[in-house]
């Protein structure tokens, strides 16, 4: 339903927050047959028969009935409110709808063992509350387990913080509607604060919003490249952000921990990248001191958030409950009804710098401690970076003694063979194709002198490679768009965007960046063979690469990838440096020949 409703609002150009709120609330009240006498938040949003938007409301209700023939629930409202957050805001704020099953699991884990007496005055917070889904479920849990009224729970027990005004408003709306469904028609005193949680460590922070017994939620995931400069500056005030380029969710670990009372519990669904990434190194240092009791339920390649390429885990912490072990379990099918089987892993056996290899810990630890790590055994190279592969890389449609022929939308161009090299995309090695079938041609406007690659001068290009020069001129406008138009520092307009991997050692062991089955690496003896989009181990020592090939093609290495590498929902595993660099190559002793 959500996508159809969003398309309808877009088609009607209904972008004003208040108008959208009024439509959603009025529709829900009408479809639920609610009678409101006292709640002024909801009454103030209702569209009556005399309202100019009444016809729009009737049309909107008919759309809902069409798209959603079953009765509309409060969960539908949460989902709708989260869904209509603009795509631009999602990039900046990391707002996303958290499925109810996940919210319920986190809340029950944090509250189920709490004595009823403590629940009577517990303080529970969501410090990045969005539209209030977690807070709504906390309120329901407390009401069902204590008999307290929503009025009392809202005033004394639940607290929300969000940077967006519309999120604060919608949280109050949803909590009001929840109470109305249970016949509590009142004006409520809410503890929902509009503020940037990153300001927690400032003197101006509202002290009502700290010293919590429980914190639950889904901290915002915003990739570091999309984090505003001002926000980055705030993040650097937190110890957990002092490595790599941390994403926005990272500081919420430290903030939530510091906001808790001693013995307080934290339950997050969050990205699992902190377990192994450089960006998570400072977080690992922070938690490995053994001050708190920590459990991680890792979903690995299972995607909890539909249509989102995000990989997550459940993270639980009890503050100042010392433990020298981390509790880790894997759940790769998303079934939250299954009791996790946690493995206890000693912190002093973990390497915070290189990342935590937690899955099947003992087996992986053995593979990472016997021999020479791949990262030290052999140099790896990524491919060239032209920043316009479609200009430089082609499959000839014909050839003769002197030229390859390149077909483009502008016509057919002869390209001098002398300026071309063979190039491959080694990612294609994971498919059932022959090596020869994936060879392409690369226009290589460089000459190699004394181990250095230098661009061929334009005057030489015109004279020696006139046909290639003519073709490149036809692409000049396209080439000028590289690096967002900032190409003035290129040695010439037809130079590649980057100079990486222009010179490679003679021997190359080629393999894909992602694989869904055991590898079959290709070892090539060709100093001029170039690479794009994939990865290769390179060396002038053929025997070294032969040994490495036998290891990478082995079932043992594949089992290591399955246990340790970053998984994807499509069944693929990553072969990036961070995923494989710690796997050890066995030391092979040469026998003495008598």
Language-model-derived ranges and their functions:
Residues 119-121, 153-157, 187-189, 194, ...:
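Short, well-ordered loop/turn elements at secondary-structure boundaries
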Residues 365-594:
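Polybasic, glycine- and aromatic-enriched phosphate-binding surface used to engage nucleic acids
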């Amino acid at each position: 339903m959500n996508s159809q409703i969003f398309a309808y609002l877009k088609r009607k150009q209904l972008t004003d927050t208040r108008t959208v709120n009024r439509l959603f609330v009025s529709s829900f009240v009408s479809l639920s047959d609610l009678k409101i006498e006292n709640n002024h938040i909801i009454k103030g949003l209702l569209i009556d028969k005399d309202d100019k938007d009444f016809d729009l409301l009737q049309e909107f209700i008919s759309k809902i009935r069409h798209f959603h023939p079953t009765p509309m629930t409060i969960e539908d409202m949460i989902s709708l409110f989260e869904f209509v957050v603009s795509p631009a805001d999602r990039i900046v704020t990391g707002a996303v709808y958290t499925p109810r099953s996940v919210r319920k699991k986190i809340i029950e884990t944090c509250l189920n063992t709490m004595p009823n007496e403590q629940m009577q005055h517990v303080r529970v917070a969501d410090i990045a509350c969005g539209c209030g889904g977690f807070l709504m479920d906390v309120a329901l849990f407390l009401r069902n387990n204590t008999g307290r009224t929503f009025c009392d729970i809202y005033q004394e027990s639940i607290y929300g913080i969000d940077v967006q005004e519309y999120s604060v408003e919608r949280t109050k709306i949803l909590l009001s509607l929840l109470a109305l469904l249970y016949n509590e028609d009142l004006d409520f005193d809410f503890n929902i604060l509009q503020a940037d949680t990153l300001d927690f460590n400032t003197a101006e922070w509202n002290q009502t919003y700290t010293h919590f017994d429980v914190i639950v939620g889904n901290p915002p995931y915003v990739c570091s490249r999309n984090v505003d400069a001002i926000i980055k500056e705030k993040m650097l005030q937190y110890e957990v952000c002092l490595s790599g380029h941390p994403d926005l969710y990272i500081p919420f670990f430290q903030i939530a921990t510091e906001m808790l009372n001693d013995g307080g519990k934290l339950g997050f669904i969050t990205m699992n990248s902190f377990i192994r990434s450089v960006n998570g190194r400072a977080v690992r240092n922070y938690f490995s001191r053994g001050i708190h009791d920590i459990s991680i339920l890792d979903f690995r390649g299972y995607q909890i958030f539909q249509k989102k390429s995000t990989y997550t885990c459940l993270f639980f912490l009890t503050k100042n409950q010392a433990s020298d072990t981390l509790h880790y379990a894997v759940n790769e099918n998303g079934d939250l009804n299954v009791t996790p089987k946690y493995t206890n892993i000693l912190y002093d056996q973990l390497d915070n710098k290189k990342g935590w290899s937690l899955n099947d810990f003992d087996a992986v630890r053995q593979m990472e401690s016997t021999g020479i790590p791949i990262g030290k055994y052999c140099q790896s190279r990524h491919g060239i970076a032209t920043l316009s592969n479609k200009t430089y890389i082609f499959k000839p449609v014909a050839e003769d003694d002197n030229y390859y022929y390149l077909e483009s939308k502008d016509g057919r161009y002869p390209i001098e063979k002398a300026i071309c090299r063979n190039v491959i995309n080694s990612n294609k090695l994971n498919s059932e194709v022959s090596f020869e079938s994936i060879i392409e041609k690369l226009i290589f406007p460089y000459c190699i002198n004394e181990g250095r690659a230098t661009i061929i001068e334009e005057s030489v290009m015109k004279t020696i490679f006139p046909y290639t020069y003519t073709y490149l001129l036809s692409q000049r406008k396209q080439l000028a768009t590289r690096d967002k138009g900032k190409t003035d520092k290129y040695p010439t307009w037809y130079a590649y965007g980057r100079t990486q991997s222009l010179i490679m050692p003679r021997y190359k062991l080629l393999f894909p960046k992602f694989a869904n089955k055991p590898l079959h690496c290709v070892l090539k003896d060709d100093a001029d063979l170039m690479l794009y989009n994939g990865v290769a181990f390179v060396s002038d020592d053929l025997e070294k690469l032969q040994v490495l090939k036998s290891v990478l093609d082995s079932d043992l290495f594949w089992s290591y990838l399955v246990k340790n590498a970053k998984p994807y929902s499509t069944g693929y595993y990553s072969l990036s440096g961070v995923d494989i660099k710690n796997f050890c190559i066995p030391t092979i002793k040469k026998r003495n020949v008598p």
